[in-house]
Amino acid sequence: MNKNAIQKFAIWARNELIAQVSQRAYQYGIDESGFGDASADTLNGRLLTAEEKSQRQELIKQIKEKGYQQVMEEVAYTWFNRFIALRFMEVNNYLPSHIRVFSDASGAFKPEILNDVLHLDLPGLDSGKVAEYIESNDTEALYRYLLLTQCNALNSALPVMFERMGGYTEMLLPNNILRQDSVLGHMVSDIPEENWQDAVQIIGWLYQYYNTELKDDTFAQLKKNVKITKERIPAATQLFTPDWIVRYMVENSLGRLWLEGHPNAELHDGWKYYLDEAEQEPEVETQLAKLREEYKTIKPEEIKVIDPCMGSGHILVYAFDVLMQIYTSAGWDQREAAQSILKNNLYGLDIDDRAAQLAYFAVMMKARQYDRRLLTRGIQPHIHSIIESNSLGGAYKLAMGDFLLSKEHQETLNYLLDAFIDAKEYGSILCLEKRDYVGLLRAWNLTASQTTESLNLTLWFAAVEHEIPKLIEQAIILTQGYDVVVTNPPYMAVSNAGGKVNDYVKKNFPDSKADLFAVFIERCGQMAKKNGYQAMITQHAWMFLSSFEKLRTKLLAVDIVNMAHLGARAFEEIGGEVVQTTSFVIRKSHIADYKGEYCRLIEPTSQQGKEDMFLAGENRYAADQSNFSKIPGSPVAYWVSDKVFSIFSENNELRSICAVKVGLQSGDNNRFYKFWPEVCFSAINRGERNALRNPKWFPCIRGGVFKKWYGNQDSIINWENDGAQIKTCKSAVIRNTQFYFYENISWSEISSGGISFRYNYEGSIFDQKGPCCICKNHSDLIYLCGLLNSKPTQTILNILCPTLDYSVGPVSTLPIVMTQEFKVVELSQNNIELAKTDWDSYETSWDFKRHPLV
């Protein structure tokens, strides 16, 4: 697949479509500055048709509600989605007419539909209009008409992708679409046709690349402290999951669910990312055997699978393939299986309308691959964009009488109308009460229209008749249990979201409130049935950071079946070390002493390298997760040996031997910090606290580059009058002043490599980037400096701090073996002196005398 061509086209197409759609709006007197008379009958001397007038008024109404830019964006992506859907269908010969809309048989941008127009059998086609366009030689107008008619014709088969035309979206179809340099021309000529052939993944790549500039702009605004709105959350968080990781997640959750109860060597061998169970103790095997007996009773049509953050549907499409293999292994015909999968198995939700459209389309095209008549059967999948109830009003405001023939249904309806206000802010993390939503849907369809007793209720029903069933089905999807929950959730600090999301998460998910990916870990666990499976790819921070310790406690109460610990660069589109990920499969059960299978893939520096290591079976560990609690904070340290676990359980922590403290935050570094050569040297108090009368400048330990034993002493801080000026700074945080000016050991809180510990003489302050250990006994401090700089300590810190963050919390829990071995102190002291001599041999040291070679 030529991703460079796809990316280049998608980014260009978005800007071009927005410009072209805006130009069409301008032709109707509408631009960013205003829209004139909404009820105008003429524009620029031209009389508007009744249809144009209605479309224009509808457009103006939308602009009033959402804003001009948002509406132009929405119309642009609506046409983009339709164009790529039609292109996919024509290349794969899925169009009911079997006549190409954009190209000819050779693949050139010469629409076949124009050449065959006189023989075209297309529902809704007006042959009279066609004849008029041909007679007037208006090829552009003819093609616009044919394109709109084709979209309308697909409405009955694919109503979510091809909504019935006639609204302002039709009015804003760009001009000059037959030109070679149009969006259609570039789509046909720039993306190789083979990229569209039976490769529905192209839909996901187009969606991701289409959002590139919007995503960049969103993060640029975030740096200016502009929160991410619900309209921009999809662009900010959408990330196309690598195909092999999708296969790993689906095969080890959905595939495992089936194989555990229905062993099948052919299926097992065909799923190359499937991991066999780790070797278990006999007692564990007995418990697993009981689970397998339960799984034996499951039938293919009973399996429920959901992706609650489905994006463009990549995971659902592969789940469809695996379900098809399960069905056929159970004796089903492919055609009937495809229909059953749509009706019974697959569910998907997303807050982004355009992503939901594409996911819906991708799943339908996958079903069409197995059933040639699928598009004529009227079957629709359970794939939905979250909808809000804001514009639906509240039935409870009206006299309801015997509406729905049930007070319970009335109360449930009103509950949903309240619960789904601003639902796109929250998406699938919305937690609803368990109620009879299925009964409510049945009652709505059977009795609602006959039980509206008052005029107001009748008018309200007429306005919401078709929207309420969507709301109810949404509630059903959010509350029913699933055998398999599999997703790649959004990665976004909750603090970057709007206040509504922030407040909701703090109230409902206090143990995972730091990031949306963690919230979804917890939420997906709620959606899974007992003994069901949960498969995800998330940032790996939840495995180690103290802010997720309570979440880890919850996760360690269920069985981690296996994990592919990916680390950095698991996504080829993301470079650097910041985004580090892990993919894992959880079974919602708890078997004591169960061992999960863990694949440590953090060393390869490319997406392909990680996949190759996984398939090679390298770096595999079988770990009993109950051991994790032996380490402070219970990190998911699956690679740790029993010997190392015993080191933690048998020795004291660093914080029990010395004070381990974090320092101050000045609140304004440019104002309060300097490098020592920037001030008069004699004005720096480097010794006893009162060596100078009313001193202003003091040495300050601030972390720095990797340097063991001694060094990184080049910063000073304004601490005049005990930091009086700093204390007036609103954003300053003053901590642990009672430990200032003592000799200590410091390290850099953030490090891209290993950690290094340095000895500091008396007389320094320390800040948050240079935390310190302070001991009462000088010999103990020197001994600790040696121990902390040893290789065993680095090995243990790799367990406690596998991210870039060596904060005080995990470092203070280091297990420490104290001995009276004088040799350790002597060697450590020698190393400190050698390191100081080296540091002082450069002019950047305030103790520099002369270069050693002079």
What is each model feature region?
Residues M1-A265, M364-E388:
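Non-catalytic, mostly N-terminal accessory regions of nucleic-acid modification and defense proteins
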Residues N4, S97, V317, M324, ...:
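Signature of N6-adenine DNA methyltransferases within the class I
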Residues L59-Q62, D276, Q280-K304, E453-V486, ...:
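Flexible, glycine/threonine-enriched loop-and-boundary segments that flank and lead into catalytic domains
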Residues V75-R87, L358, F739-Y740, F822, ...:
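Elongated alpha-helical scaffolds
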Residues A76, Q829, D838-V854:
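Terminal accessory regions of large proteins
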Residues S156-Y295, E653-R655, A659-E688, W697-C700, ...:
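Class I S-adenosyl-L-methionine
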Residues L206, M249, G311, V485, ...:
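Conserved hydrophobic/aromatic pocket- or pore-lining residues that grip, position, or stack substrates
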Residues K224-M563, S589-H590, I602-E603, D612-M613, ...:
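SAM-dependent methyltransferase catalytic region
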